[in-house]
Amino acid sequence: MYPFATTGNTKDSLYKEVNLPAEFESVLINKLAALDHRYLKDLKINLGNVLKSQTLNRKEALLIALSVAVNEKNAALITALEELAKAEGADEKEIAEVTACVSLMNANNVFYRFRHFMHKEFYDNAPAGIKMSIMVNPVLGKEFFELLSLVVSALNGCEMCVTSHEQSVLNHGGTPARIFDAVRVGAIFKSFSVLV
């Protein structure tokens, strides 16, 4: 059913899945490929599976993957995923909003994680003082913006933010299955970005 995968074509097919050029060099992927490590095959399958979600269309899955690349500051993956997202109909405003969302969530994740750790009345009651106008009327739509915010917050480990954004996604018509699929995209692309 599956053709025999050699070291070269396992790496090549992995790169093709996420639009990285064949000549792209990753020390860690090269080490795994040199050993024909079975994890590369698993990773390729995982990447393909999360990009073919039941509850996310391909454009949405790619924009979530892009949010991971931006969060992890992975320039090669950002470029590759932007191209794939554009091929699925994403425009410059949507791509820019993904970047803005990731940046804002990084501020919020640090701030609210601090509040959560401290459990002190002063910190809990003091105004955050963080401008968040992009959350009011997002180009991507409120439900999807909240879904992106949830994934980035999960990546950054902010329990308060994850809980809040999960409820907001549900309030805006999202489903638990859609949330689960989005977080899976985030998890798999985080695992890939470790190697790239």
Enumerate the predicted regions with their spans.
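Short, leucine-enriched amphipathic alpha-helices that occur as contiguous helical runs
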Residues: 61, 145-147, 151
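Short cysteine clusters
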Residues: 155-161
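Amphipathic alpha-helical segments that form the core helices of the histone-fold
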Residues: 67-68
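Short, intrinsically disordered, charge-biased short linear motifs at domain edges
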Residues: 137, 142-147
